[in-house]
Amino acid sequence: MVTWLLIFLLILPFAFVLLYGAPYLPTRRAQAKQALDMLDLQEGDVFVDLGSGDGAVLVEAASRGLICYGYELNPFVWAISKLRTLKFGKQVHIYCRNFWNIPLPENTKGVFVFLLDKFMSRLDKKLTRELTKGGQLLSYTFQIPGKKPAVVNRAMFLYKY
């Protein structure tokens, strides 16, 4: 009985995030590099990863000199991302919180997201309200319904808006 309870408690955070975004899928370093290459960001720009998982994209962004913010609901992968980004100090801020309830940081220039298709319209509304003028969105796998991406990387299913 205790074993089943422990298994349930371990699986619960991974299943819970499906209500608000997408399941945890690790991003490889090469994928993070390719993704960030698509964004026109300069050292010191504010970058946000909505559903930051294990912090792979944040590590790559911070290594480019970006000021990074990550939001992750799953406490296990959030803890991993905190550990992975310790070397960047105050350059990287990671929160175990629901990004739907928090405004984007001031002067956000770039946003990376992997969300399920059903959340993309809601994300578009949030970014229309909160993203800095000229800010960029890079979506992994899913497009915003009714909007044409400015750039598409079909090999990696990346869509830049």
Question: For each predicted feature, which ranges?
Answer:
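Conserved SAM-binding loop
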Residues: 81
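A short acidic, Gly/Pro-enriched loop at the edge of an enzyme's catalytic core
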Residues: 102-110
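C-terminal substrate-binding/active-site "lid" region of AdoMet-derived donor-dependent transferases
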Residues: 118-161
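Conserved SAM-binding strand-loop segment of SAM-dependent methyltransferases
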Residues: 88-99
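Conserved class I S-adenosyl-L-methionine
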Residues: 43-53
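S-adenosyl-L-methionine
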Residues: 1-42
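Conserved SAM-binding motif I beta-strand of class I
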Residues: 67-72
